[in-house]
Amino acid sequence: MSFDGKQLAHEILLTYKNRDWSQVKLVILQTNNDVSSDAFIRQKMNACNTLGAQSELIKYHESVTEKELLEKIQQLNTDPEVTGIILQLPVYPHLKQNKLLKAIDPYKDVDYLTGNCPLPIRSCVVEAVLILKEHFHHDFTNKQIVVVGLGVTGGGPIFHYLKETGHQVVGCDKHTPNTMELIKTADVVITAIGKPHFFKTTNFKPGVILYDVGVSRNVLNKLCGDIDPNGIEKVAKWWSPTPGGVGPFTVLAIMKNLWVLYEAHQRRI
């Protein structure tokens, strides 16, 4: 079973419109020339527009210095009109990604990439998977779960969340020698390696549940997931396509987190 994630996420997003978003503001800092990032940013800004929230994109040239960015982040941290800050990844190679992320005020870290926000929010990719899990009634109890790819914006947060919540989960990266063997016996596979159609139908057991978090472009510059969709419906009980699968729900999660940050800010005024 597959589904239209874009439509479903939009329907859920519309249920948030009963709140007053007029004083909510999201600022996105872009320090890359990545086409996929451009698409993700548009989705986030469109979601803000749908709900009536404010959004601002600040795009930097490759000549930007780390000092300039840190000063800008500090300015946004202290601006009472800014609710949430996103540093769109990846960053230019000469910039220290972790240093920039750590500079963001935890109370404005809408992506939860610092992991330091004391408010009840989660990493957007984790929240996206959990929204889908709940909506489609996927029970992970006593299931063998394999997460492939442990990057900071993809499989890493998902793996750590599942491990911390007591699930039977194994994390695989490029150093794992038996990844394919683990996948073949897994009940749930979550892929986040960013390689177009890397996994085939033959890699999975019948009845598997597949969350495809990876995003990349093939030789034709077409947006793809990690899992080849050709024939996958014959093996998988359920799978999320790319594009239009997990991605729209990460945007939904950002808006969900943004509202929590806004409410917390209002309480502190």
Curated annotation (Swiss-Prot):
<keyword id="KW-0658">Purine biosynthesis</keyword>
<keyword id="KW-0028">Amino-acid biosynthesis</keyword>
<dbReference type="GO" id="GO:0006164">
    <property type="term" value="P:purine nucleotide biosynthetic process"/>
</dbReference>
<dbReference type="GO" id="GO:0004488">
    <property type="term" value="F:methylenetetrahydrofolate dehydrogenase (NADP+) activity"/>
</dbReference>
<feature type="binding site">
    <location>
        <position position="215"/>
    </location>
    <ligand>
        <name>NADP(+)</name>
    </ligand>
</feature>
<dbReference type="Pfam" id="PF02882">
    <property type="entry name" value="THF_DHG_CYH_C"/>
</dbReference>
<keyword id="KW-0368">Histidine biosynthesis</keyword>
<keyword id="KW-0521">NADP</keyword>
<dbReference type="GO" id="GO:0035999">
    <property type="term" value="P:tetrahydrofolate interconversion"/>
</dbReference>
<keyword id="KW-0486">Methionine biosynthesis</keyword>
<keyword id="KW-0554">One-carbon metabolism</keyword>
<keyword id="KW-0378">Hydrolase</keyword>
<comment type="pathway">
    <text>One-carbon metabolism; tetrahydrofolate interconversion.</text>
</comment>
<comment type="function">
    <text>Catalyzes the oxidation of 5,10-methylenetetrahydrofolate to 5,10-methenyltetrahydrofolate and then the hydrolysis of 5,10-methenyltetrahydrofolate to 10-formyltetrahydrofolate.</text>
</comment>
<dbReference type="Pfam" id="PF00763">
    <property type="entry name" value="THF_DHG_CYH"/>
</dbReference>
<dbReference type="GO" id="GO:0009086">
    <property type="term" value="P:methionine biosynthetic process"/>
</dbReference>
<dbReference type="InterPro" id="IPR020631">
    <property type="entry name" value="THF_DH/CycHdrlase_NAD-bd_dom"/>
</dbReference>
<keyword id="KW-0560">Oxidoreductase</keyword>
<keyword id="KW-0511">Multifunctional enzyme</keyword>
<dbReference type="InterPro" id="IPR046346">
    <property type="entry name" value="Aminoacid_DH-like_N_sf"/>
</dbReference>
<feature type="binding site">
    <location>
        <begin position="149"/>
        <end position="151"/>
    </location>
    <ligand>
        <name>NADP(+)</name>
    </ligand>
</feature>
<protein>
    <recommendedName>
        <fullName>Bifunctional protein FolD</fullName>
        <ecNumber>1.5.1.5</ecNumber>
        <ecNumber>3.5.4.9</ecNumber>
    </recommendedName>
</protein>
<dbReference type="GO" id="GO:0000105">
    <property type="term" value="P:L-histidine biosynthetic process"/>
</dbReference>
<dbReference type="InterPro" id="IPR020867">
    <property type="entry name" value="THF_DH/CycHdrlase_CS"/>
</dbReference>
<dbReference type="InterPro" id="IPR036291">
    <property type="entry name" value="NAD(P)-bd_dom_sf"/>
</dbReference>
<dbReference type="InterPro" id="IPR020630">
    <property type="entry name" value="THF_DH/CycHdrlase_cat_dom"/>
</dbReference>
<comment type="similarity">
    <text>Belongs to the tetrahydrofolate dehydrogenase/cyclohydrolase family.</text>
</comment>
<dbReference type="GO" id="GO:0005829">
    <property type="term" value="C:cytosol"/>
</dbReference>
<dbReference type="GO" id="GO:0004477">
    <property type="term" value="F:methenyltetrahydrofolate cyclohydrolase activity"/>
</dbReference>
<dbReference type="InterPro" id="IPR000672">
    <property type="entry name" value="THF_DH/CycHdrlase"/>
</dbReference>
<comment type="subunit">
    <text>Homodimer.</text>
</comment>
